[in-house]
C-alpha cells in the first residue's frame, strides 16, 4: 500500500518557489507529484522535478485519484534511465506532450496506457529494448502514428490493442519476428482494418481471439500467415 508523508505548510511552500527536486525512488517521486497537484492543480508543471535517478515508474500516474487526474507538463523529464513503465498512465486523463522522451532503456511497457485518454505523438520513441507491450493500449483512446517503431525485441503483444476502439494505425512494416504471444491483440479494435499480411509470425505460438470483433476477423487476406489458423 502506498504511504504518503503528511503534507505540511513548509513542504507546500517549497512548491511555490522554483526549487529543483531530486527524488531517488519511485515512492519519493509519487509523493512529490501528489503534493504538487494538491498545491497547484492537476494541470501543473512538473518539469522542475529531476527524475533522472528513477528506474521504475510503475503506477506513477495511477496510484490514486489525484495522480489519475493529472494533465500537466512533464515534457522535459529525463526518463533515460527508466526500465519499467508498467501501468504508468493506466486509467489516467493525461494527454500531454511526451514526444521527446528517451525511452531507449525501457523493457516493460505492460498496461502503460491501459484505459487512458492519451493520444499524443510518440512516433519517434525508441522502443527497441522493450520486451513486453502486453495490454499497452487496451481500452485507450490512442490513435497515433507508431508505424516506425522498432519492436524487434518484443516477445509479448497479448491484448496490446484490445478494445482500443479509436486505433487504426499502420503497423504493416513492424518487425514482429520475435513475438511469441498475440492473444487478443486486436480483439474489440472495431476500426482496425490495416494490412498485416506481411508480418513474420513464425515464432508466434499463441494468437487466440486475435481479431475477434474487429474488421480483420473477416478480412482474411489482411491477416498474418499463421501456420495453424486459430484466430477467431
How would you label these PLM feature ranges?
Residues 2-232:
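Negatively charged
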Amino acid at each position: 500500500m502506498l504511504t504518503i508523508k503528511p503534507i505540511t505548510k513548509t513542504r507546500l511552500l517549497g512548491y511555490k518557489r522554483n526549487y529543483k527536486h531530486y527524488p531517488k525512488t519511485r515512492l519519493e517521486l509519487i509523493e512529490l507529484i501528489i503534493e504538487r497537484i494538491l498545491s497547484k492543480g492537476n494541470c501543473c508543471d512538473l518539469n522542475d522535478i529531476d527524475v533522472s535517478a528513477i528506474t521504475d515508474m510503475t503506477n506513477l500516474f495511477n496510484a490514486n485519484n489525484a495522480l489519475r487526474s493529472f494533465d500537466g507538463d512533464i515534457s522535459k523529464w529525463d526518463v533515460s534511465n527508466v526500465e519499467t513503465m508498467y501501468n504508468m498512465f493506466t486509467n489516467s486523463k493525461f494527454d500531454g506532450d511526451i514526444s521527446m522522451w528517451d525511452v531507449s532503456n525501457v523493457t516493460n511497457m505492460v498496461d502503460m496506457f491501459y484505459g487512458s485518454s492519451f493520444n499524443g505523438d510518440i512516433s519517434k520513441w525508441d522502443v527497441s529494448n522493450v520486451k513486453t507491450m502486453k495490454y499497452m493500449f487496451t481500452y485507450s483512446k490512442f490513435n497515433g502514428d507508431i508505424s516506425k517503431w522498432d519492436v524487434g525485441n518484443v516477445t509479448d503483444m497479448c491484448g496490446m490493442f484490445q478494445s482500443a476502439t479509436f486505433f487504426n494505425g499502420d503497423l504493416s512494416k513492424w518487425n514482429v519476428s520475435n513475438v511469441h504471444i498475440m492473444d487478443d491483440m486486436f480483439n474489440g479494435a472495431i476500426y482496425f482494418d490495416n494490412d498485416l499480411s506481411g508480418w513474420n509470425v513464425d515464432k508466434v505460438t499463441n494468437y487466440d481471439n486475435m481479431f475477434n470483433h474487429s474488421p480483420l476477423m473477416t478480412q482474411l487476406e489482411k491477416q498474418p500467415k499463421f501456420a495453424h489458423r486459430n484466430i477467431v
